[in-house]
UniProtKB/Swiss-Prot annotation:
Primary location recorded for the protein, binned into one broad class: secreted
Region: Disordered, residue numbers: 372-477
Protein name (database record): Cell surface glycoprotein 2
GO CC annotation, single: S-layer
Source organism (scientific name): Acetivibrio thermocellus (strain ATCC 27405 / DSM 1237 / JCM 9322 / NBRC 103400 / NCIMB 10682 / NRRL B-4536 / VPI 7372)
GO molecular function: carbohydrate binding
CDD domains: Type_II_cohesin
Domain SLH intervals: 453-520, 521-584, 585-648, 649-669
Subcellular location: Secreted, Cell wall, S-layer
Top-rank taxon, per record: Bacteria
InterPro entries: CBM2/CBM3_carb-bd_dom_sf (IPR008965), Cell_Envelope_Struct_Comp (IPR051465), Cohesin_dom (IPR002102), SLH_dom (IPR001119)
Keywords assigned by UniProt, alphabetized: Cell wall, Repeat, S-layer, Secreted, Signal
Amino acid sequence: MKKNNVLTIAAMIALLLTSLLTSITFGETSSIPSRISMELDKTKANIGDIIIATIRIDNINNFSGYQLNIKYDPSYLQAVNPLTGEPIKKRTMPAVNGTVLLKGDQYSITEVVENNVDEGILNFGKGYANLTEYRKSGKPETTGIIGKIGFKALKLGKTEIKFENTPVMPGAKEGTLLFDWDAETITEYNVIQPKELAITLPDDAHIALELDKTKVKVGDVIVATVKAKNMTSMAGIQVNIKYDPEVLQAIDPATGKPFTKETLLVDPELLSNREYNPLLTAVNDINSGIINYASCYVYWDSYRESGVSESTGIIGKVGFKVLKAANTTVKLEETRFTPNSIDGTLVIDWYGQQIVGYKVIQPDKITVISEPEVPTQTPTQTPPTTTAPSQTPTQTPPTTTAPSQTPTQTPAVTPTQSATPSDPGGGGGGLPGGGGGAVNPSASPTPTPTSKPTPTATKKPEPTEIEEPEPEIPGTVGIHYSYLTGYPDKMFRPEKSITRAEAAVIFAKLLGANENTKINYNVSYTDVDSSHWASWAIKFVSYKKLFTGYPDGSFKPNQNITRAEFSTVVFKLLVSEKGLKEEKIEKSKFGDTKGHWAQQFIEQLSDLGYINGYPDGTFKPNNNIKRSESVALINRAMGRGPLHGAPQVFEDVPQTHWAFKDIAEGVLNHRYKLDNEGKEQLLEIIDN
């Protein structure tokens, strides 16, 4: 009896332990509701990092398969294999390293994949095909990892990865479809979306202004260096450096030459690769103690596609010569010309977006040590000397030679502005015979002789060297009239394509025509009547034989004009206005223009330096030309601009834009002067 009691107690203890363990195990599982979730291994990443999204199911009863639709922004993220980094393509199964749906040898597995990575869509599914055998096993897979997907960070900013509904998955629950082993759709579960992802710069990313010395004396030269560190994907930068011009003089640290309005920072390491067409510019205000410098790549796409970011190195250098003993500072400072800048710095990435989230490191104050006093030498007493008897001067006979004339200073000549031509061919300036050519001085200065001096009998005078000042030579001055405009919202839209009608207006205005220009020429197109806004321009350029219609009698005014077509019009303009002749093309410069109908025009304009191709050796003749490209081409061909010293006209064309000066040349009526370097400098904006 005693033995039976012991067995009974032992059995009860075992039963209690089993119940306790079971309740603990089931308790842990049942505490998690039925769900599918996507979790990111990090919610803060740097450009180039791979974020791993883990998709898992929990407590999905009798789970046998799924179909998912995942949406992300392809400008910020690239879907990749998390193990190899290989990009995911249209038919690539994105989810790898799962722990469920692995028994293909027993139940057969079916997969379906239809990704659209250009749109940022991953649509894929997987499931057991032999559901009968799977169901008979009595061992459903309820919890585990469906798979892991990698996302490579491309661009700074905040973005999301999420399950999202799509028309191709009717009945889906937030972009998810789950199936059980009876081939039924499961509906009772939650969908857990991942948190927002922030793609940022590294924590130590910064722009710094460093001085090679801060304790100096008068006459010393301080070298200030603008540096970048870990500025990932940087494609352009503008800096505004402020100093006291009464204490410091901005100079080239190597040559000592003073900075001028347009002097660039020297010795740049970053943003200077010619393969991506670097654009460097400066708008300094030396009198106010401001160095404003910008550099950027024009070919952002090629730079971005290289995958190699210039993030750490020297932006440029400037020297400061110490003029007087006074403590001072040199620093990066805000300016109204760079709105939204960070402590006087504005950085853009290779998508053309502003980069934020970096630090700006300023230099220490400059201490100027007073010049040491130079000891005064004690003069020694001069011993008395015996006075020599003075010699009786010999009278100098009168000279008969007439002295050379001493010219007075040559007066500066004020150039006279020529009248505005009424001929339609002259309004553009820069054309032969047009309004805006060189203006000759009105008169030649005549030297005025001095009177003939009377010779002195007592002493022969020492000849005095008279410095003859060089006459001030006026630069070439003239007028250029605008040939294109912006939009009413104060935008220029430099990246926008232009239509054939818009191009017709540009060339008509370039040649001085307007809506009131009368020409004796009849032309008609089936799709351009007199009420069309550009009919006057289309008629004019057709009269000039710059444009022709199509065989069906249409002009197609709303069709975008290509790079090849625009180049052809420019070539015809040079033929008619400047007498350009066709020359035999010995060798094709571009890989994609050989045999093209516009090869002659493209190659010859390129040889003249008016147009360029792309870094890959192509011209892309059939691509639509952009507004910024068109104005630059016209200016080069017609010998106009770029216009220096122009104010910002459009909100979307800052002074750092590669075509800023060319756009200003094209949209402003202005008087100009060519400086001694041949640069066109703005004198005055003329009202329309």
